[in-house]
């Protein structure tokens, strides 16, 4: 069933990846997304340029690659695939000069996963063809 915060804010379907990131942002950052619905793939807006505000989510959107280095707490967005038409979202739990670690819910693999991080011509690439971008709280 659907998981709601005490004030009625829609966190999403229990145990899904979207519910995890929305619950994390609500409990840890006290952040409510203006648009509370959608699948993971809906969190990335293809019409936005790197670093623009994603109004539906109330967060800055960065592409992969991006001029801005990923940060702990950023939401990573994975594009849909043949086996997963909904896409996937996760949270960056660790960043260093050459890798990021994510934490995630509702995956067959591990709840934590690492990806290489490369800087080429002042652009930060998270090495995965599945990662289309990320969302970040405005500073």
State each model region's role:
Residues 41-107:
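...with weaker cross-activation on analogous glycine-rich loops/strands in unrelated enzymes
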